[in-house]
A protein has these predicted regions:
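Basic nucleic-acid-binding interfaces
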Residues: 1-70
Length: 70
């Protein structure tokens, strides 16, 4: 699985919003949902590449699809 290094958490939130996710709540992490899936994004920059890969997988996207949304 190719990694997604250096992704800013705000860019990740915007990309997931384009994919149909909405912010459910915020704190030290941003919790987003599309109605059936829930993903949690840490609010620190940059988000670790392995963590970002897991978030993308949990959102039901491929790394390539996510990169197109960035």
């Amino acid at each position: 699985m190719p990694s997604l290094p250096g992704v800013n958490h705000q860019d990740a939130v915007r990309a997931l919003e384009k994919a149909g996710f909405r912010v459910a709540r915020q704190g030290k992490h941003v919790v987003m949902t599309d109605g059936s899936r829930v993903v949690t994004i840490p609010r620190h920059n940059p988000v670790n590449a392995i963590t970002m890969g897991n978030i993308v997988r949990d959102a039901g996207l491929t790394n390539e699809e996510f990169r197109e949304l960035l």
